[in-house]
Amino acid sequence: MKIILKENFETLGKAGEIVKVADGYARNFLIPKGIAAEANLRNIKALEHDKQNIVRKAEKERKRHESLAASLSGVTCTIARRVGEQDKLFGSVTAMDIEEALLAQNVKIDRKSIVLDEPIKAIGEFPIVIKLGAGVTAEIKVNVVPEQA
């Protein structure tokens, strides 16, 4: 089934594109959630009419993500954890911990956008990539320190 994307969808494409997907995926997920519309003649004509609006909305979203990335550059969050021998952490620092540390600094980031290849299990400073969307990423530093007893 051919559909018209109403908004950017990471696995399918950008808003305004016509893509082909499985019928069930379109009918049961994309169309009911308002992510896409069926690509019939009427909707294609409406798309041509609304294309300027879609492009403007996508550009506004990209600028918002870029300004957020600029505000995040240079941000360092410190997380204190109990350590054992050889500065090994008891447990690990996960995306949820980083999200909470950023919230304490009044920076609201969804933990799903924090990219961790694997949880942090050592003391030190680590660069962390945050995917903000629209192809925009930001990098912050996470400083893991031993907890004071």
Curated annotation (Swiss-Prot):
The reply to whether Ribosomal protein figures as a keyword in the UniProt entry is yes
The record's family statement is: Belongs to the bacterial ribosomal protein bL9 family.
Show the stretches that span the lipid bilayer.
Answer: none
Bridged cysteine pairs (disulfide): none
The record's PROSITE patterns line, in alphabetical order, gives: RIBOSOMAL_L9
Q: What is the lineage of its organism?
A: Bacteria, Pseudomonadati, Thermodesulfobacteriota, Syntrophia, Syntrophales
What's one GO MF term for it? Answer: structural constituent of ribosome
* GO biological process, alphabetically ordered: translation
- Quote the protein name from its UniProt record: Large ribosomal subunit protein bL9
Under the heading PANTHER family, the entry gives: 50S RIBOSOMAL PROTEIN L9
InterPro entries the record matches: Ribosomal_bL9, Ribosomal_bL9/RNase_H1_N, Ribosomal_bL9_bac/chp, Ribosomal_bL9_C, Ribosomal_bL9_C_sf, Ribosomal_bL9_N, Ribosomal_bL9_N_sf
Q: Which UniProt keywords apply?
A: Ribonucleoprotein, Ribosomal protein, RNA-binding, rRNA-binding
Q: Which domain of life is it from?
A: Bacteria
Q: What function does this protein fulfil?
A: Binds to the 23S rRNA.
Instruction: List, alphabetically, the GO terms of the cellular component aspect.
Output: ribonucleoprotein complex; ribosome
